[in-house]
Amino acid sequence: MNYQAILNQIQGDIQPYLGQGKVADYIPALAGINPSKFGMSIHTIDGITATIGDAQEQFSIQSISKILTLTMAVSLDDTNIWKRVGREPSGSKFNSLIQLELEQGIPRNPFINAGAHVITDLVYSHFDDPKEAILAFTRMVSMNDSISYDYVVAQSERETGNRNLAMGYFMKSFGNIENKVRDVLDVYFHQCSLAMSCTDLSKAFLYLANEGVLPTSEKTIITKKNSDRINALMLTCGMYDSVGDFAYRVGLPSKSGVGGGIVSIVPGEMVIAVWSPGLSESGNSLAGTKALELFVNYTGKTIF
Amino acid sequence: MNYQAILNQIQGDIQPYLGQGKVADYIPALAGINPSKFGMSIHTIDGITATIGDAQEQFSIQSISKILTLTMAVSLDDTNIWKRVGREPSGSKFNSLIQLELEQGIPRNPFINAGAHVITDLVYSHFDDPKEAILAFTRMVSMNDSISYDYVVAQSERETGNRNLAMGYFMKSFGNIENKVRDVLDVYFHQCSLAMSCTDLSKAFLYLANEGVLPTSEKTIITKKNSDRINALMLTCGMYDSVGDFAYRVGLPSKSGVGGGIVSIVPGEMVIAVWSPGLSESGNSLAGTKALELFVNYTGKTIF
Amino acid sequence: MNYQAILNQIQGDIQPYLGQGKVADYIPALAGINPSKFGMSIHTIDGITATIGDAQEQFSIQSISKILTLTMAVSLDDTNIWKRVGREPSGSKFNSLIQLELEQGIPRNPFINAGAHVITDLVYSHFDDPKEAILAFTRMVSMNDSISYDYVVAQSERETGNRNLAMGYFMKSFGNIENKVRDVLDVYFHQCSLAMSCTDLSKAFLYLANEGVLPTSEKTIITKKNSDRINALMLTCGMYDSVGDFAYRVGLPSKSGVGGGIVSIVPGEMVIAVWSPGLSESGNSLAGTKALELFVNYTGKTIF
Amino acid sequence: MNYQAILNQIQGDIQPYLGQGKVADYIPALAGINPSKFGMSIHTIDGITATIGDAQEQFSIQSISKILTLTMAVSLDDTNIWKRVGREPSGSKFNSLIQLELEQGIPRNPFINAGAHVITDLVYSHFDDPKEAILAFTRMVSMNDSISYDYVVAQSERETGNRNLAMGYFMKSFGNIENKVRDVLDVYFHQCSLAMSCTDLSKAFLYLANEGVLPTSEKTIITKKNSDRINALMLTCGMYDSVGDFAYRVGLPSKSGVGGGIVSIVPGEMVIAVWSPGLSESGNSLAGTKALELFVNYTGKTIF
């Protein structure tokens, strides 16, 4: 297939959707983004690439970073992790404390905020300098040493992060956070602030399309089984409270962030990254979701 | 691949798991089943079949019938249906009323009981004799005119169905059941009582592996898009409250029933049906889930 | 004190509040009431009476009937009753099913609908003709043999009672309803339909102001201890989801109904009954609550 | 009545109950208490006093301090307070976050922990040195300048207070905490650590039995209306999740603490304070509740 032609087609189709939705505005650094931005990038495991629009522009990857820390965590300790966090869809908002109370401080899955805190806490316990470790891992998989944290965003998150603090202390009260809550959240807010482009992202997650092996470096990042499992978790839990709707429309393991990015995996074939800051009510990029739906319609590349 | 050889291998591997778990005992007709039963059947879209064990023996398909009525419903009216039932995982027990109250009588998806009631209600409204229509559809897709309801099971369900009645009247109070609650549940209890074998099931659902077209008769049952969507719903909502765990271990769109049956779709390739009455705590066949996990390990046929 | 003068004063004060609020309209028989109706009646245990406005006019007592059946139930069996229903405020709407699910079919108290169903079920089990028994008890305490059910209201309730049916079947599924759900609810809908006047009500509940003894007939209805307890339950659970606000403003054990009636007990002294059909958001008579607040302000007769 | 004789009688009756229940052990300072301690004290508004047992011994008043700060808050600002905290029983545990989420950060009442945080936050905003102000108020109403904070207890609370921190940050995320969460909780943990005796307590709260006026000093602490209202809140919300059961058994406006203290008001007459460290499952002093029940049985002094 001529992926570049398909992306070009999508760029035309997507125009009416640009600027729709609501840009995340809970911190000033995100609120200032131009809502009409749109970029899309593909990397296949065979080395084919295609890009359109603002695919080279860095943005705040936010919750997409949860795949990075989850990958690190399963490679560090893939047994204990599942005693501290579940693998089921939550059926409720990404930042709800209700389920956490009903289920005694065990978050439903690693992609809701509380679950991501636990994963970051686990990573935290394994490194002297966890922020450095996460950054090194990110640069390694994306083969881009210029990637870094956006300290302005991280600081903003920290200042407005009362609900994340509430979750952290709540889990701590159940004994499910090992380190100091503020220290874990400091790392968490930094990972969310990672500034990456669509091109970075579609390259970085190729190991999830290639049975755990990064085709660019032939390095094994995780086992095939764990790669399959992360894909399964992305499909069932990766898109906030609209995983079902997204699976229904797009049907690819995916993870979104409130910065407007979405990463989708076509197992055995490729990674697609898309970015557009306007969000739907469920917190996923509105034009990004539409672009992925078009991509699947044009290529038939759904897992179903 | 030599599917028969793989099934034979699985039959050996599975022996330690037979008789484990708990047979559904809320009605006498199900409680009396021999817990060591085990059958498995494959139908590929190319006409290859393989079976082992009790694959020809009929059992109560229970919630697997929800795929049959959902298929009928989307072919009858695939727009209004999604105003009355969601497409998201529930994050709670299949028969919980909590979410129904919080979300004003709109069930989370068509595979929890409340959602299935709405689907049956929708089917009910389109036919003079809905029980006859569902039976005719089932016989047609499975190409087996001897399939019928088990009236003893249906009667037992009705006598113990207080929680289903509670759900039905609760949704009726929100205006989300059109017909008489008792009439809709009478049809629902009958569809659950359908007695089918693994062979029947792996043949019947071939249209979900073949873009909506039944390869046995070349008849189009639903559109490709709707076929993809039912697969997506099965993956995200088909295995009660362990969809995430099942996707993590097996990774195929599947639907289970408390009779011990599970149907799994390998899109573009085949349908696998398995039956063993012992249930895990989440209500899915314990040996059946293990058999599917082994099948995926031996064949690599996961969607991830 | 000159209670008649105080009631006259209140009748003047209350004029701006008449017609405010929303008349219960879920059944036609209630929706047709003139919203400006207002009546108030006092009976002291010493035989003093005072009335104003529409105090002689019969209206649908609705949930006030829950005191009648609770009184019957505690006199029939005051030990087992508290295994089947709690004594705590619910913290949620009178017809919520959420708590019922979280607490395994045991309603929080006898004054939410589910709790009242259990009480009616208990009464039902003790009589050949429970409807006749409840009516006889009501006539006895109010010394008015002309009181009867309003069969039009009862029939309307039955036709729109889907949520009550949902609760009944839900508790039945937990084993907490002994008789047939429809039979119990038939009695429940009849007790709610009882047509009584303010005068009837302030006379009927004098036993709750007089340590369990009806001063009019010197008949012991219940023990002093049980009388105290029903007053305590009325104070903590009698006013739907605004018991705290009502205790804060009025401070008397009270029970309201969606027909617009409220009964308040001044222990050791008197019973006050008030009626005005316009309801506040919490489902209590708006002018009735105001009238009681004025009464307490003028007389200082609060229990606090 | 001869109150001393009645207390002496109770001291005999209560022996079998001493040492029953479970001493609060979440902090070492509380866990070390002798579970057989028992004291009881009465102060009437006419100046009569009576004491038994360990009535002079200081203990940690814990949640009883919520009456002190609520009294300060209503005298400082009795309008805005009710926009930030409700007046309804919670129907759930004293430290639940579920309701807080469902009701957008507005706690149900001032006596659950979250509600007490809001009250302390409000007091905090009015004073340069809020800890000093609370201590001064406490000494003033109890006429005992030797009362002070137990800094060991306060420090222990702070170290184990993750759940309180979770609540604080959660409400902060809804905008319902004005000051820094840690600062407010520091004050809160100190007020909970106040060491007072039964005698101190029965003297301190006389204003609630005397229409807002402290009879010892003839000082008006709050208006009669606010005094009635605090009594109403104590009755409907003061005993954790067993207010209904307590009202049923004792029937007096009361507030308990996990230190084993309970304060009960007989409006117009007296205050009773009781202390015994063994707690029932609901967190109230077991022998203390029994002693109050006996007192009401012997004296008939219930509000119902």
From Swiss-Prot, chains A, B, C, D:
Q: Show the Pfam families listed in the entry.
A: Glutaminase
Gene Ontology BP annotations:
glutamate biosynthetic process; glutamine catabolic process
What are the GO MF terms of this UniProt record?
glutaminase activity
**Catalysed reaction per UniProt?**
L-glutamine + H2O = L-glutamate + NH4(+)
The EC number(s) attached to this protein equal 3.5.1.2
What enzyme category does the UniProt record give?
Answer: hydrolase
Q: Which residues bind substrate?
A: S63, N113, E157, N164, Y188, Y240, V258
Keywords from the named record: Hydrolase
Is the keyword Hydrolase assigned to this protein? yes
SUPFAM superfamilies from the entry?
beta-lactamase/transpeptidase-like
Q: Family per UniProt?
A: Belongs to the glutaminase family.
Q: Which PANTHER family match?
A: GLUTAMINASE
Quaternary structure (record): Homotetramer.
What is the protein name given in its UniProt record?
Glutaminase
Q: What is the lineage of its organism?
A: Bacteria, Pseudomonadati, Bacteroidota, Cytophagia, Cytophagales
Q: Gene of origin?
A: glsA
